[in-house]
């Protein structure tokens, strides 16, 4: 199952045409690595060095100057570490250094999470909880992240191990917090054998991915097959801002680029990827609705 780090690599590879476009790369040669506050960095190669932004791991740094003979980068004091809102962090020796990254890792992660946040209600995560049925009790607490109840069943007594569906229930999204320690409860009106286990499947808003080793399906709650929906959504979001860096008045380099590519090339590519995203989103939505259809039930 893919994790956040693999999704980031997939988006990077797709946006760079697999191997067609390659960022300039060197490596961190400081013995023992660097701390979160070090401003001098030894590197393994002086090729293609330039003043500006570099990326180490998830952190962006602003390089104020460099020394080709001693193979060192000098980071600007104050704002140079954790540049553009990234988090300063220690980095190990031989860590990859990307010079002027086209698509910084933090921006890709944000685009992935923005896509995940936009999926609900077309796509939703699925979770479940269990509790013991009490004949004297009607309302049972549900987890705080519950959005809707999808299916309820209970385990019958005896060796059959059968789980019967429950058809008389009602969800309360404004339950008394003092009574249940949550605002989500389910009222069960079916006749269930006391002491038996009741299982509730419920929908949740997909969770964001935070750490590079976060498992996609395990953390978000989304189906494994929706992975490409998220990567396509991140790709069209990132591509939609490419043209802003090529506006004629921004730099001499932008003027030169405009002689080779039209100024709307990024927007055109973004629209194409967006169409693919919409198609896959619709396909996954139909699959999820087929797996968890709206079930007729009584509310009293």
Listing of model-derived features with the role each one plays in the protein:
Residues 1-35, 46-72, 87-300:
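Glycine-enriched, solvent-exposed interface loops adjoining structured elements
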Residues 39-48, 57, 77-84:
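A structural micro-motif recognizing beta-strand termini
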């Amino acid at each position: 199952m893919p994790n956040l780090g693999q999704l980031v690599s997939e988006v990077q590879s797709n946006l760079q045409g697999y191997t067609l476009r390659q960022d300039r790369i060197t490596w961190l040669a400081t013995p023992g690595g660097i701390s979160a506050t070090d401003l001098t960095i030894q590197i393994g190669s002086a090729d293609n060095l330039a003043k500006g932004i570099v990326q180490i791991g998830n952190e962006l740094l602003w390089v104020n100057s460099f020394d080709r003979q001693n193979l060192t980068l000098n980071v600007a004091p104050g704002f140079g570490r954790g540049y553009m809102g990234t988090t300063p962090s220690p980095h190990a020796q031989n860590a990859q250094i990307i010079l002027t990254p086209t698509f910084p890792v933090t921006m890709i992660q944000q685009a992935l999470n923005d896509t995940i946040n936009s999926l609900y209600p077309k796509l939703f995560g699925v979770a479940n909880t269990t509790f013991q049925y009490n004949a004297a009790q009607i309302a049972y607490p549900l987890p705080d992240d519950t959005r809707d109840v999808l299916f309820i069943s209970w385990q019958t007594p005896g060796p059959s191990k059968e789980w019967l569906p429950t058809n008389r229930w009602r969800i309360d999204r404004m339950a008394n917090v003092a009574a249940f320690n949550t605002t989500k409860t389910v009222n069960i009106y079916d006749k269930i054998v006391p002491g038996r286990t009741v299982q509730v499947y419920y929908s949740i808003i997909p969770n964001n991915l935070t750490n590079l080793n976060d498992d996609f399906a395990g953390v978000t709650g989304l189906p494994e097959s929706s992975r490409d929906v998220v990567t396509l959504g991140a790709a069209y979001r990132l591509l939609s801002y490419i043209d802003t860096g090529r506006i004629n008045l921004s730099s001499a380099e932008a003027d030169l680029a405009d002689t080779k590519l039209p100024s709307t090339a990024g927007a055109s590519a973004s629209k194409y990827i967006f169409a693919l995203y919409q198609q896959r989103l619709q396909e996954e939505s139909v699959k999820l609705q087929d797996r968890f259809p709206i079930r007729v039930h009584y509310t009293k």
